[in-house]
Amino acid sequence: MPGMEYSTVSKIYGPLMIVEGVKGVAYGEVVEIETESGEKRKGQVLEARENLAIVQVFEGTRDLDVKTTSVRFTGETLKVPVSMDMLGRIFNGIGKPIDGGPEIIPEDRRDVHGAPLNPVARAYPRDFIQTGISAIDGMNTLVRGQKLPIFSGSGLPHNMLAAQIARQAKVLGEEEQFAVVFAAMGITYEEANFFKKSFEETGAIERAVLFLNLADDPAIERIITPRMALTVAEYLAFDYDMQVLVILTDMTNYAEALREISAAREEVPGRRGYPGYMYTDLATIYERGGRVRGKKGSITQMPILTMPDDDITHPIPDLTGYITEGQIVLSRELHRKGIYPPIDVLPSLSRLMKDGIGKGRTREDHPQLAQQLYAAYAEGRSLRDLVAVVGEEALSETDRKYLKFADRFEREFIAQRYDEDRSIFETLDLGWELLAELPESELKRVRKEYILKYHPKYRKRGE
């Protein structure tokens, strides 16, 4: 029953504890746990039976004793205190300030699992979000309300890319408030300091809310951290009409925490030991994005995950790909070449790109230019493999130009400085500069009128 306190903890294992002899306990109910020394921790009911409750402890079960630990069931679900004062602040994985500032005075308290959204109430994602990164803006455009994950690998610079996107992202042509909600799960102290420094030194912290769960924090916190972040994002987007970009890193650490809890509960494992309900669980995070009819605000998600062994068929990226609307893939080969950001545009995809670009959104030539750049780069990459077999001497003059185009595309279009913020017009013009490397007869995917208007050869004549 709500408010009842029990000292009937029968077992503690991993992040879980079993409380026996309970009555009227509900799934998802918040509990307060008190140790013999008076220390208080929070937990949540994972499973409720007739007279037994399985509780997950957010701060971990270290130093808890079955004989001296008491548990009080509050009768409430986990709620997040929300306020506009959270902008510019840094919190730990369960929402406590860690920046030395005061506690937040909440304007409201929201359920951490969010309010259910009628699918009919959803508005289709549209409108271009400029990240300042050519490989994304030009080739795999991010659209307001989209879910576009970044598939990375261990040792690749996804943290730098996340910080750069958080710093540079903006909605063009509108006087709208833009905010970033950044949630990091299972990161090291070094990574946490990098993110803090990056946000604070560039002033991006003023429009951001940071949730940082460190590697030595209890793994169970990682289950709550992204939901905390999304609850705050929903508040900013749908109560204050803000355009919110949510960056979640690293979703692989989240899935590992999910597997740890599943193993502790002795559930039947699914693929590679992950719980069979991981798809559903990930969907409860990724589907908390988008736009709502009648509301000006939006939530755009960019989850980041490191693929174990660079395996894109691993259950985490595999299931993520089913739920989200594309992927940005980082390449170890490009990283070895010293190219930052090492975005491989060929396996990357933004399924909603067509709805956020073109006349009135970016520029009229954008869709066809992106197709032409993609086709030319794919041809150049294919010819590299051929050269490895037959040598460059066997290639035609046009083939050699494709090879040169592929090299320049990587060095000039994909590659850019960490502090370089390219506008979409700079990106598109750069694309045309590179296409000038090829014979005009090879530009078969672009209308003649766009060639006459934007191709450097004709543009310079017009000037």
UniProtKB/Swiss-Prot annotation:
<dbReference type="InterPro" id="IPR022879">
    <property type="entry name" value="V-ATPase_su_B/beta"/>
</dbReference>
<dbReference type="InterPro" id="IPR020003">
    <property type="entry name" value="ATPase_a/bsu_AS"/>
</dbReference>
<dbReference type="Pfam" id="PF00006">
    <property type="entry name" value="ATP-synt_ab"/>
</dbReference>
<dbReference type="Pfam" id="PF02874">
    <property type="entry name" value="ATP-synt_ab_N"/>
</dbReference>
<dbReference type="InterPro" id="IPR004100">
    <property type="entry name" value="ATPase_F1/V1/A1_a/bsu_N"/>
</dbReference>
<dbReference type="GO" id="GO:0033178">
    <property type="term" value="C:proton-transporting two-sector ATPase complex, catalytic domain"/>
</dbReference>
<dbReference type="GO" id="GO:0005886">
    <property type="term" value="C:plasma membrane"/>
</dbReference>
<keyword id="KW-0472">Membrane</keyword>
<dbReference type="InterPro" id="IPR027417">
    <property type="entry name" value="P-loop_NTPase"/>
</dbReference>
<keyword id="KW-0066">ATP synthesis</keyword>
<comment type="function">
    <text>Component of the A-type ATP synthase that produces ATP from ADP in the presence of a proton gradient across the membrane. The B chain is a regulatory subunit.</text>
</comment>
<keyword id="KW-0406">Ion transport</keyword>
<dbReference type="InterPro" id="IPR000194">
    <property type="entry name" value="ATPase_F1/V1/A1_a/bsu_nucl-bd"/>
</dbReference>
<dbReference type="GO" id="GO:0005524">
    <property type="term" value="F:ATP binding"/>
</dbReference>
<dbReference type="Pfam" id="PF22919">
    <property type="entry name" value="ATP-synt_VA_C"/>
</dbReference>
<keyword id="KW-1003">Cell membrane</keyword>
<dbReference type="GO" id="GO:0046933">
    <property type="term" value="F:proton-transporting ATP synthase activity, rotational mechanism"/>
</dbReference>
<comment type="similarity">
    <text>Belongs to the ATPase alpha/beta chains family.</text>
</comment>
<comment type="subunit">
    <text>Has multiple subunits with at least A(3), B(3), C, D, E, F, H, I and proteolipid K(x).</text>
</comment>
<protein>
    <recommendedName>
        <fullName>A-type ATP synthase subunit B</fullName>
    </recommendedName>
</protein>
<dbReference type="GO" id="GO:0042777">
    <property type="term" value="P:proton motive force-driven plasma membrane ATP synthesis"/>
</dbReference>
<dbReference type="InterPro" id="IPR055190">
    <property type="entry name" value="ATP-synt_VA_C"/>
</dbReference>
<dbReference type="InterPro" id="IPR005724">
    <property type="entry name" value="ATPase_A1-cplx_bsu"/>
</dbReference>
<keyword id="KW-0375">Hydrogen ion transport</keyword>
<keyword id="KW-0813">Transport</keyword>
